[in-house]
Amino acid sequence: MKRIPIKELIVEHPGKVLILDGGQGTELENRGININSPVWSAAPFTSESFWEPSSQERKVVEEMYRDFMIAGANILMTITYQANFQSISENTSIKTLAAYKRFLDKIVSFTREFIGEERYLIGSIGPWAAHVSCEYTGDYGPHPENIDYYGFFKPQLENFNQNRDIDLIGFETIPNFHELKAILSWDEDIISKPFYIGLSVDDNSLLRDGTTLEEISVHIKGLGNKINKNLLLMGVNCVSFNQSALILKMLHEHLPGMPLLVYPNSGEIYNPKEKTWHRPTNKLDDWETTVKKFVDNGARIIGGCCRTSPKDIAEIASAVDKYS
């Protein structure tokens, strides 16, 4: 059965919670795909051999999507978090905007064909930080206000705006207030379909650059009717599992009328210097307990980010069935 428009679902069906897939990059890595690349999880798509029906890497990507869908995911992402034009053109054989457009079109078409018409598809757009590896600090240098964010996002954003297979555009893991304000300043001519913004927030409930959730909410409320009507959800992603429910609760309190989304990491902690993951010493809550808190605090899309697997998504889906 074909899906209804996602804006209609979020606005007119307030009891419906969608299940997002999990940590695609880390899951592909666990399945043997080499993503040690400046374009990270998009690396397999840059090889012409990927598009051959017999490609082993293609089969692994399809199996990952299949396992997430079997687990209960009904909204999935394109594997394009680090596929901005700047990173792709600097690190692959794709050098022109025309070739880049064909590249994104192929990824979106492949994903839509595989997940079917009944599930929603998010066009994933990573932050400016992804190009310079500072998602965990939000340090955009001495003059973040002077960065041309629109120029950076434009090629990928325009493609997703125009692609009918994309239901929702996701600006993921935004760690810097200047970048957030830039995105929020863009009107319907720049972002012409439903979108969300996922904030990268630390364990102290601060944006990675130190901005408070209260400052963010004051800015959003201050935009009034100037805000892009296509902003469908706000939320957090790539955040600590243990702190995610509290962070979402705070965001819900600051933006009580805003539909929210949340997809935390698995609970393992990433060391950006060593590029390794390790288990925390403190005990983690389980998904059922955490998802109930998410639902109670306005979450309409729930999934997983780094190191979350189909098993995690199955637990999320079970809890959503129970509490929504």
Curated annotation (Swiss-Prot):
Its cofactor is Zn(2+). The keyword Acyltransferase does not apply. Keywords: Amino-acid biosynthesis, Cytoplasm, Metal-binding, Methionine biosynthesis, Methyltransferase, S-adenosyl-L-methionine, Transferase, Zinc. GO terms for cellular component: cytoplasm. Residues 6-320 form the Hcy-binding domain. One of its GO terms (biological process) is sulfur amino acid metabolic process. It catalyses: S-methyl-L-methionine + L-homocysteine = 2 L-methionine + H(+). It is found in: Cytoplasm. Its EC number is 2.1.1.10. Signal peptide: none annotated. GO terms for molecular function: S-adenosylmethionine-homocysteine S-methyltransferase activity; S-methylmethionine-homocysteine S-methyltransferase activity; zinc ion binding. Zn(2+) binds at C238, C305, C306. InterPro entries: Betaine-hCys_S-MeTrfase_BHMT, HCY_dom, HCY_dom_sf. The keyword Transferase applies. Its main location: cytoplasm. It is an enzyme of class 2 (transferase). Homocysteine S-methyltransferase involved in the conversion of S-adenosylmethionine (AdoMet) to methionine to control the methionine/AdoMet ratio. Also converts S-methylmethionine (SMM) to methionine. Present with 606 molecules/cell in log phase SD medium. This is Homocysteine S-methyltransferase 1. It comes from Saccharomyces cerevisiae (strain ATCC 204508 / S288c) (Baker's yeast).
